[in-house]
Curated annotation (Swiss-Prot):
Subunit composition and interactions: Monomer.
SUPFAM superfamilies per record: Terpenoid cyclases/Protein prenyltransferases
Protein's recorded name: Triterpene cyclase polA
Family listed: Belongs to the terpene cyclase/mutase family.
Provenance organism: Polytolypa hystricis (strain UAMH7299)
Catalytic activity, as annotated: (S)-2,3-epoxysqualene = motiol
GO CC, any one term: lipid droplet
Residues at the active site: 393
Biotechnology (record note): Polytolypin and biosynthesis intermediate compounds show antifungal activity and can efficiently inhibit the growth of the pathogenic funfus Candida albicans.
Residues forming coiled coils: none
Length: 695
């Protein structure tokens, strides 16, 4: 009988398979770009755009869309924000409208079930503002019952607490084109024609004769119930409505031209706007309403960019909310470094470095300049190309990847520029947000159009944790002595300010909230991955915070050895770390939370590592590369639950490479820890000579 292999042995085998799979998935031998799964709304709104522009669909396109929409439906007929997530009326009505536009018969069982869900829940009265907005463009909702979006917002000075630059980058890029659309109030044709009072969706209403559904309480109802800010914004909206939305006021033509100029200026050379679907959709509609023909170079390149969001496979045709080439490549680069099986002179790796360097944002673009005009550019973006909106999280993880593979590059121009940029983007409160500086005017979420509560980009624990990790790795680098001493002190001071914010914002139960990943498991992992660089004897406050977080991570481990947290924890903190079966990515995050602080033999770590090793499969995730890049060799991990976050409570994502690079990273860090403890035995030869990642 063959002796049972040790956990380090099995981990090494799993890592080799994972590296092979990663190689198979690489595009052009220099980058990775997995699909971003979300909910059906983005595909639906692509169809709305095509319908509004009068662009026909081929039968093959129709069949592909129909097949995909039907696969997304819940058993009760609804459509949710994520697979197996409770029904959402906005997602359901947009999916139903899409299927009906495509010619799918309304007497089919799937349509009957969706209709029954909407009627049973009185869903039409509860759709979000954006859904109302796009229904109004087809005459399916009265424009009078949509909040105002006055073009005069463009006139507000930058020092005002309410102006386009106090909105978050994504809200700004989305809302500015909608100012023009709201001004024009178009009515586009559906298959039954163009009608101001179109009855195309009347079967979804319990009372189709009354579609005048208020989007807020009356001012009288608000008195004594709502805060003064909400009342003031609502009152302003009512006044603007009474004045006809200012449409006939002097200067409207100038304001429309101002918006058009802003939109054209913000188009990337690739044709994109904002690297995210809503700005693409709204901007094309706005420019066409302002007289741009469909063959205009701006519109043509914009439509070409839209098509790069398309995915088509056996499951049907759909459109992504965004793309994530730079993020995927950066995280994969760190994972390859941490697993210790890729030499720095590997041609794939050197090609990836060149790919990164070409994409550093060093031009004159960038809305971040409005409030940080003296700061030198040097960030990286989330997408392949998004020069207007680099973000500090991506910049930090690119720097980590470069430093882990090439420690001697610490003084290179690209890294120093990147470091200077993220230092300059640190918020006055000591933490970091994703895209903007000091973007914390949370009262803006009280405007009638802010029902998704995502109009700002304040400091968050997960981003701050990543930045502390990046700064800590920079300071503790074996080549840090080659860096200017004053600059190192600046980095140290910045890190300490970030740590102070994290200590002040730890949850009572020991975890940290995750803005961009689900949820407390993600936030806590990012924070603990950074704090260990700054542990030292005598700092009782920091050590206590770490101890509480480590104990919390251990307390939510599942019986199978993994970790799983559901989306519902965003609605109910009592569900933090709970509510989902174990997932590969969340298990990896949790292992990385623990590795710096406990022995490699700690039961929580070994059970977690064992879970990842056991659940690695030949096919990995069903959501892996459907663009002809599914790994034919190597292994990955299955993951059907969404672990990425767009807007908590409103948009959830699954990055199809999440269940690959995070487990690689975790297993690599475990193996290094095991090596340090003398547990790797005969594996020493395989581990010898590789750069030693700091874990």
């Amino acid at each position: 009988m063959m002796p049972t292999k040790s956990l380090p042995d099995r981990t090494m085998e799993a890592l080799k398979e994972a590296v092979q799979y990663a190689y198979e998935c690489q595009f052009d031998n220099d980058h990775w770009s997995g699909e971003v799964h979300s909910n059906p709304i983005f595909t639906a709104e692509y169809l709305f755009l095509r319908q509004a522009l009068g662009l026909d669909f081929t039968q093959d396109e129709k069949d592909g869309f129909i097949r995909w929409f039907l696969l997304q439906q819940n058993e009760d007929g609804s459509y949710g924000l994520a697979p197996d997530y409770p029904g959402d009326p906005s997602t359901t009505v947009e999916s139903y409208l899409s299927l009906k536009m495509l010619g799918y018969p309304i007497d089919k069982p799937e349509m009957v079930q969706a209709r029954d869900y909407m009627l049973r829940t009185d869903g039409m009265k509860n759709v979000r503002i954006f859904t109302r907005f796009f229904l109004a463009t087809f005459g399916l909702w009265p424009w009078d019952y949509i909040p105002q979006l006055p073009l005069e917002l463009m006139l507000m000075p930058q020092r005002s607490p309410v102006n386009i630059y106090t909105l978050s980058s994504w809200a700004r890029a989305t809302c500015i084109p909608l100012l023009v659309v709201r001004h024009h109030q178009p009515i586009y044709a559906l298959p039954n024609g163009a009608h101001k009072d179109n009855d195309f969706l009347d079967e979804l209403w319990n009372d189709p004769s009354n579609k005048k559904i208020p989007y807020s309480q009356s001012l009288w109802q608000m008195v004594g119930k709502e805060d003064l800010t909400t009342i003031a914004f609502t009152a302003a909206d009512k006044v603007i409505s009474l004045l006809g939305g200012f449409r006939k006021f002097p200067g409207r033509r100038y304001l429309r031209r101002t918006v058009v100029d802003w939109l054209v200026m913000h188009q990337e050379h690739s044709g994109d706007w904002g690297g995210y679907w809503p700005p693409m959709h709204g901007t094309i509609l706005a420019l066409v309403l302002e007289g741009f023909p469909l063959n205009h170079p701006v519109i043509r390149s914009g439509m070409e960019a839209v098509e790069r969001y398309a995915m088509h496979d056996k499951n049907g045709r759909r459109y992504q909310a965004t793309t994530c080439a730079l993020w995927d490549t950066a995280v994969m680069t760190v994972a390859l470094a941490d697993c210790g099986l890729v030499r720095p002179n590997n041609v794939r790796l050197t090609n990836t470095v060149e790919w990164f360097l070409k994409r550093q944002c060093r031009g004159t673009e960038g809305d971040w300049r409005v409030y940080r005009p003296e700061l030198q550019p040097g960030g990286w973006s989330f997408q392949d190309i998004d020069n207007w909106y680099p973000d500090v999280d991506d910049t930090a993880i690119v720097i980590l990847g470069l430093l882990k593979h090439y420690p001697t590059s610490i003084n290179s121009e690209h890294i120093i520029r990147g470091m200077n940029w993220i230092l300059g983007m640190q918020n006055p409160d000591g933490g970091w947000a994703a895209f903007d500086w000091n973007n914390d005017k949370l009262f803006l979420n009280k405007i009638p159009f802010g029902d998704m509560e995502s109009l700002c980009d304040p400091t968050t624990a997960d981003v701050t944790g990543r930045l502390v990790e990046c700064l800590g790795h920079f300071i503790r680098s074996p080549h840090a002595h080659t860096v200017d001493a004053d600059f190192l002190r600046t980095v140290e001071t910045s890190a300490q300010r970030g740590i102070r914010w994290l200590l002040d914002n730890q949850e009572p139960f020991g975890a940290w909230w995750g803005r961009w990943g689900v949820n407390y498991v993600y936030g806590t992992s990012n924070v603990l991955s950074g704090l260990h660089y700054f542990m030292h004897k005598g700092d009782d406050e920091l050590n206590l915070a770490i101890s509480r977080a480590v104990e919390w991570v251990k307390s939510v481990q599942l019986e199978d050895g993994g970790w799983g947290e559901g989306l519902s924890s965003y609605d109910d903190p009592a569900l933090a770390g709970k509510g989902s079966p174990s997932t590969a990515s969340q298990t990896a995050w949790s292992i990385m939370s623990l590795i710096p602080y406990v022995p490699a033999t700690d039961p929580a770590v070994t059970r977690g590592v064992d879970f990842l090793v056991r659940f690695q499969t030949l096919l990995g995730s069903d959501h892996a590369y459907d663009r002809g890049k599914t790994g034919k060799n190597g292994k990955s991990w299955p993951e059907d639950y969404y672990t990425g976050t767009g807007f908590p409570g409103h948009l959830y994502l699954q990055y199809c490479l999440n269940p690959h690079y995070w487990p690689m990273m975790a297993l690599g860090r475990y193996l290094r820890k095991a090596k340090g403890a003398g547990l790797t035995g005969h594996l020493e030869d395989e581990l010898e000579g590789f750069p030693e990642p700091v874990v």
